[in-house]
From Swiss-Prot:
Keywords per UniProt: Lipid-binding
Keyword Transmembrane helix: no
PROSITE patterns reported for this sequence: DEGV
Keyword Ribonucleoprotein attached: no
Membrane-spanning parts: none
Gene3D superfamilies: 3.30.1180.10, 3.40.50.10170
Species the sequence originates in: Corynebacterium glutamicum (strain ATCC 13032 / DSM 20300 / JCM 1318 / BCRC 11384 / CCUG 27702 / LMG 3730 / NBRC 12168 / NCIMB 10025 / NRRL B-2784 / 534)
GO molecular function, one term: lipid binding
The protein's name: DegV domain-containing protein Cgl2349/cg2579
Binding annotation for hexadecanoate: T39, S73
PANTHER family: DEGV DOMAIN-CONTAINING PROTEIN DR_1986-RELATED (PTHR33434), FATTY ACID-BINDING PROTEIN TM_1468 (PTHR33434:SF2)
Pfam families per record: DegV
Annotated ranges, domain DegV: 3-259
Length: 274
């Protein structure tokens, strides 16, 4: 049996894609307290049970686990604890430093290799390589939810509210940072297209556009990206997972991209030699 690939629901993988590639998706937790909602990561017990089930299916080939950034959730540390239960490194946990379809794309790449008979190490390597070539941006229609979750400071939230700005966030080293501040959705989308176009550097791109209660806006952004990016680029539409939607709020639109090459700041001699 091939290597088994596991993600949590923050990867935003569409159900049909996960089923086609035989990727196991474990749901993160959303808790409702009246009008307030919060999220929690997976426990080591939950993860160990899931890994054990997949090891039974895959035999000696092992399990590759990709989870939300350790900077954003306790899930990664729980995964490392759960993996240590099993002998001989049969469960490998990828330190993704990301979320959304950047993680989803890495899982897809690993699962395709697994279907072709690749080893656990080979699946791990392609997942890491895919993540190094990826970027994730998210346009926030409003900042209330992300401020409440502690992902941005009170000062930043106050300035954004006072100036009526709609930020574009970027994931860097597993943490969220502001990539750009815009006044309107149309300007934000133009900026997102510019960021993706510059980073693509004339090479085809894999793009996954996520949305939370913003389906028409996501379609508009996809059309802009299709017109701007090189021929041969591929596109996928996904829903932002409910656990991420708690923090991004309604109207959020995300862009996860996998590029042909690593960004200059991520390039190393080892990567270039592969």
């Amino acid at each position: 049996m091939p290597v088994r690939v596991i993600v949590d629901s923050s990867a935003c993988l569409p159900t049909h894609v996960a089923e086609d590639l035989d990727i196991t998706v474990i749901n993160l937790h959303v808790m409702n307290n009246g009008e307030e909602r919060s999220t929690s990561g997976l426990s080591s017990l939950e993860l160990a049970a899931s890994y054990a089930r997949q090891l039974e299916r895959g035999g000696d080939d092992g399990v590759l686990a990709l989870h939300i950034s350790k900077e954003l959730s306790s899930t990664w540390s729980a995964a490392v604890t759960a993996a240590a239960v099993f002998d001989d490194d049969s469960v490998r946990v990828v330190d993704t430093s990301s979320l959304g379809m950047a993680v989803g794309a890495a899982a897809m790449a690993a699962a395709r290799m697994a279907k072709d008979g690749a080893s656990l190490q080979e699946c791990y390597d392609i997942a890491v390589d895919t993540l190094k070539r990826s970027e994730t941006w998210i346009y926030l229609h409003r900042i209330d939810e992300i401020w409440k979750s502690g992902r941005i400071s009170t000062a930043t939230a106050m300035v954004s509210t006072a100036l009526a700005t709609r930020p574009i966030m970027r994931f860097n080293g597993g943490r969220m940072e502001i990539a750009a501040k815009t006044r309107t959705q149309s300007k934000a989308f133009a900026k997102l297209v510019e960021l993706a176009q510059i980073r693509a550097d004339g090479e085809p791109v894999f793009i996954a556009i996520g949305q939370n209660e913003a389906r028409e806006a996501a379609k508009q952004l996809e059309e802009l990206l299709r017109n701007a990016l090189p021929e041969g680029s591929s596109f996928m539409s996904v829903d932002i997972d409910p656990t991420l939607a708690v923090h991004s709020g309604p109207g959020a639109v995300s862009v996860s991209a996998v590029f042909a090459n690593q960004a200059p700041e991520l390039s190393t001699g080892k990567a270039g030699a592969k």
